Amino acid sequence: MRRLCYILIALCLTFSAMAEERTVAIREITVLGQRPMKEIGVQQTKLDSVALKENISFSMADVLTFNSSIFVKSYGRATLSTVAFRGTSPSHTQVSWNGMKINNPMLGMTDFSMIPSYFIDDASLLHGTSSVNETGGGLGGAVKLSTKPADADGFGVQYIQGIGSFKSFDEFLRLTYGNDHWQISTRAVYSSSPNDYKFLNRDKKENVYDENMNIIDQYYPVERNRSGSYKDLHILQEVYYNTGKGDRLGLNAWYINSNRELAMLTVDHGSDTDFDNRQREQTFRGVLSWDHIRRNWKVAAKGGYTYTWMAYDYKRDLGNGVMAHMTRSRSSINTIYGQAEGEYYIGNKWLFTANLSMHQHFVESRDKNIVLQQGGNGILGYRKARPELSGSVSAKWRPTERLGMSLVIREEMFGREWTPIIPAFFIDGVLSKRGNIAAKASVSRNCRFPTLNDLYFLPGGNPDLKKESGWSYDAALSFAVGKQNVYSLSGSASWFESFIKDWIIWLPTTKGFFSPDNIKDVHAYGVELQVDLNVALTKEWQLGLNGTFSWTPSINVGEPRTPADKSVGKQLPYVPERSSTITGRLSWRRWVFLYKWCYYSERYTMSSNDISLSGKLPPYFMSNISLEKSIPLKHIE
């Protein structure tokens, strides 16, 4: 369960060899200018530095929950958190970090609770067809995360400690050094908590008995979250070198060590001392980059490596004080990454790009608790290698200042199978400079191959699965108005529609386990709304408001599998039809009052959309309120 209250007390010490920084109020200014050629027709949400850094203890799952229209499925802090666009599933969301894809090749998804916002300097969401500009497989969209040079001058040290309720501690450290050519940064985050908060358990009822042991009343018990502790360590090393002659070199290395208990169910009547339910992970990600930049062209290359080791252990007391291993799942992933790209401008009207990337995965998954067969092979598990190749070329044309068009051609290979050509066409135009009213539209094909677990997981994997494929259409209107140092107002409204064939879904079998199959043709459509308002009320008082709303039906339009199949024409399970967020920020001098609210409509747990007590999840609301005051300490010179 999500923690209901988290109070953060931060002590920040900053040491610098340079002159003292000053905290200044930044007033919003609407800047009107030509749209970047790279972004012709692209529908994206860029998260600014305020959203990324306003609460240093946030993971990227928390940031996206309150600052975007996408669906974030989370079970609370330090628990699995996934994101999905436009009524699709988390495996339809492609995620990259400094250009390298970080989707788990076994599951196809990314755990955003494992990404501290403290480690991210730039984040953007590419909605729907716009993801084809970056990669294939993003039937819903893509999330781009990256770091950038610290822009330090000399040595710098930043240390922040967060102390929260339920013995929660967060430690943040950053060391920086910079000059005209070098930028070096080391960041570290350590978070820990027993996470044993109290809550009213409405999934249980305790009986009240009279002296004759007759039930005379019932009540909901107040319990503590059991078996929910966590210890997470993250270290990020960055080195950047700029020759000053158009060449830039970069190194990014990120290490994760996580040890998390998995909380007991709210309907579990056992004691937390009777079992141990734990997930551990060690991950290393490294990216080397080179950029060669000239006035009208650029070439770049990247190479990277990812290693992930994950363990899941489940132990129970047999009743005699001896803990028995029920499950000992182990998996390891090694991924080699390479990418080359180029850009060429012809005047200010044409931009041509080409990109080729490769990810080679080596995956081993097994359960060490399974009795070994002859030859030492486990009954449950697999060992597979799969290459993933993606290449694209594009031409972007801006015949006039107001009009832009873009054509992208992409093709991908997974294993030995190639996708059909993936075309995407984008167009945008300024309808009126008064109000900066712009329109965008796009259309694209897209494909996604099954994950390794979809194909080979034992028991249940289906090696005969087909790839998912379909066409998507987008259209949007946006505006931006404002008066310098007074106010700014911007907003957008977009419509989208996707037709996906051979949708993959895991379903129960008569053999007692789940198995994936291509059973559904899905029609996903809807609208997304977004608005931002910033007002300088006085020289010292400032108000900021942000709101989003999404309506995202995802309907099964396939044929019934059996006469009893009631899923046709129904919303897909676990996909909310509506979601919304509101953020309000009121600042005065060094004080900031912040209110955040998010909402997800009810979700069905059955493909038939059964409305019984167990057939749906109730609507979800969450509010966060915080009051902050920054207290600068005199720098040590």
Stretches found by the model and what they are:
Residues 26-55, 82:
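N-terminal periplasmic "start-of-domain" segments of outer-membrane beta-barrel proteins
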Residues 294-314, 432, 438-440, 467-525, ...:
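Membrane-embedded beta-barrel scaffold of Gram-negative outer-membrane proteins
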Residues 197, 226-232, 245-299, 307-334:
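Flexible loop and strand-edge segments within Gram-negative outer membrane beta-barrel domains
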Residues 398-404, 494-499, 518-607:
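Gram-negative outer-membrane beta-barrel transporters
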Residues 187, 240-244, 438-442, 468, ...:
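Conserved C-terminal beta-signal and adjacent last beta-strands/turns
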Residues 167-192, 204-259, 282-294, 344-352, ...:
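Transmembrane beta-barrel wall of Gram-negative outer-membrane proteins
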Residues 100-128, 459:
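Short acidic/polar hinge/loop motifs at secondary-structure boundaries
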Residues 60-63, 81-84, 96, 110-116, ...:
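N-terminal periplasmic accessory domains that precede
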